């Protein structure tokens, strides 16, 4: 299981104990003589952790940073004084250390400002993302409402179309029945016309017979009583 990063404040003694660990690989303290004066130079290097910004990360103020650096310098000067030389011998080294620490402070402050700017950018982007999420949610709700309305319209349209189809189908059935009735009536009329035609033919035959009889009677009358 991966260990979570952590940090803590350490004293000079704890700093000395950590020299044999992996974080600090080399610590050099040099004493130099020049024209009867001695100076001490402190340098160290190694692999250090990279601090990343987390939601719970808290930045120290300039005042707190100055106080921490002041305490560190005081502890370092006391340790060097007790170990190597008097205060008079450490003035030059103290000045150099102060310069290095001041440069380190400037670097830390610069990175702190950059981190603060990046944090503001991230927070602003987070607000924009939240606004976009709210807008997206509203658009999704509006889209769902439109889809519901469209679905209802489609259902109503389909139901209305089905009703119209049912009505048309009923009317078609009624028209079919009426056509069947009319067809039956036409068949009946046609039968009646055929019967009338037959009767007319019979009447015509009888008329022809009567006409022949009249002609015969007229001929007989002419024989009996010839015209003068």
UniProtKB/Swiss-Prot annotation:
Pfam families: DUF16 (PF01519). SUPFAM superfamilies: MPN010-like, Tropomyosin. It comes from Mycoplasma pneumoniae (strain ATCC 29342 / M129 / Subtype 1). This is UPF0134 protein MPN_137. Belongs to the UPF0134 family.
């Amino acid at each position: 299981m991966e260990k979570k990063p952590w940090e803590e404040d350490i004293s000079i003694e704890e700093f000395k104990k950590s020299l044999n660990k992996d974080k600090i690989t080399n610590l050099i303290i040099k004493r130099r003589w020049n024209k009867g004066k001695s100076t001490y130079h402190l340098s160290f290097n190694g692999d250090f952790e990279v601090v990343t910004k987390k939601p719970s990360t808290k930045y120290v103020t300039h005042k707190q940073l100055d106080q921490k650096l002041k305490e560190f310098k005081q502890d370092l000067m006391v340790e060097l004084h007790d170990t190597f030389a008097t205060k008079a011998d450490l003035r030059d080294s103290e000045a150099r250390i102060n310069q290095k620490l001041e440069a380190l402070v400037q670097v830390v402050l610069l990175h702190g400002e950059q981190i603060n700017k990046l944090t503001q950018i991230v927070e602003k982007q987070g607000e924009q993302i939240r606004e976009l999420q709210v807008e997206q949610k509203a658009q999704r709700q509006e889209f769902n409402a439109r889809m519901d309305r469209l679905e209802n319209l489609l259902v109503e349209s389909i139901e209305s179309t089905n009703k119209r189809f049912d009505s048309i189908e009923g009317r078609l059935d009624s028209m079919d029945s009426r056509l069947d009735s009319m067809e039956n009536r036409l068949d009946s009329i046609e039968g009646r016309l055929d019967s009338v035609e037959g009767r007319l033919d019979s009447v015509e035959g009888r008329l022809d017979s009567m006409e022949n009889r009249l002609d015969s009677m007229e001929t007989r009358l002419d024989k009996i009583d010839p015209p003068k």
